[in-house]
A protein has these predicted regions:
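Acidic, Mg2+-coordinating phosphoryl-transfer loop and its flanking beta/alpha structural elements
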Residues: 150-188
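Short catalytic/ligand-binding loop motif for oxyanion handling, primarily in non-cytosolic enzymes
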Residues: 55-58, 108-112, 137-140, 158-161, ...
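A short, structured active-site edge motif that brings together acidic residues
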Residues: 102-106, 114, 122-140
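Conserved Lys-Pro-Asp/Glu-containing loop-to-beta segment of HAD-superfamily phosphomonoesterases
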Residues: 132-133, 137-162
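Alpha-helical substrate-recognition element adjacent to the catalytic core
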Residues: 27-116
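Charged phosphate-binding loop/patch that engages nucleotide di/tri-phosphates or the phosphate backbone
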Residues: 27-30, 175-200, 206, 210, ...
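A structural signal for isolated positions on well-ordered beta-strands in alpha/beta enzyme cores
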Residues: 98-100, 130, 150
């Protein structure tokens, strides 16, 4: 089912709360595309995944089975530990570029994911928060600009769909996946370990300088890719010095 709406994703999801739960779940699960008329953009954005990219995702489920992760009473997604490196990266990028969150979600876990975003990324407005049903093409649930934009995600199928649509796919390497030559990548796990070692002996002023250095280091890696938009992002480096 394709949906055309004049609001943002969060407002639409709140409207579903007035429906019986099973009806809302059915509507959500059958969506294949949402067109956001007021948010449609021809300018590039940077879309970033949550599970395994902005937040740790645990192969063992932290004591929950795969099915139990989606039980709303377990609040699995609400309690995921953030990747501090990625939080800093997003915080700095958002000062100079249109940064959005795009996360696949079971309907019953969306509230927990939304609260997680508001806790760790309060600077991201509701207009820049997007959810989509599990297993769908993320390019169909953003601002209509996927072919001009970057997706940072840890899951190959999401990256492949984004790349096929003409966008730039960057793979987040975390604690449970591996690099591939097909995609530019960001090694979240190694960067996280480096950041933690630096922060142990840093005061607030030094931490702010670390944030700038994070951007500088990451962009130097991305610019090696033969992608014009990634090269344009290098302009941020000048503002971080």
């Amino acid at each position: 089912m394709e949906l055309n709406i004049d609001t943002n994703c969060i407002t639409y999801l709140k409207s579903l709360q007035s429906l019986p739960l099973q009806q809302a779940i059915s509507l959500w699960d059958n969506l294949k595309e949402i067109n956001y008329a007021k948010l449609k953009s021809m300018k590039p954005s940077i879309y970033i995944d949550i599970d395994g990219t902005l937040a740790y995702f645990y192969r063992n489920g932290r004591g929950f089975t795969y099915e139990e992760m989606f039980f709303p009473e377990n609040h699995y997604f609400r309690n995921l530990e953030p990747h501090i490196y990625m939080i800093y990266l997003v915080e700095t990028l958002s000062k100079f570029r249109d940064v959005c969150i795009i996360s696949s979600a079971d309907y019953k876990t969306i509230q927990d994911k939304y609260e997680w975003i508001k806790e760790y990324l309060p600077f991201i407005s509701d207009d820049n928060i997007f959810f989509c049903p599990l297993g769908v093409d993320k390019t169909k649930f953003v601002k209509g600009n996927a072919e001009k934009s970057i997706l940072i995600d840890d899951y190959n199928l999401n990256l492949e769909a984004w790349d096929k649509n003409g966008g730039v796919a960057i793979k987040a390497i975390n604690n449970i996946n591996t690099p591939t030559e097909r995609f530019v990548h960001i090694n979240v796990r190694d960067k996280e370990n480096w950041l933690k070692s630096q922060m142990e002996s840093s005061d607030d002023e030094q931490i702010e300088k670390l944030k700038a250095k994070i951007i500088e280091m990451q962009i130097k890696n991305w610019v090696k890719a033969d992608t014009e938009f990634i090269k344009q992002v290098l302009n941020i480096n000048e503002r971080c010095n």
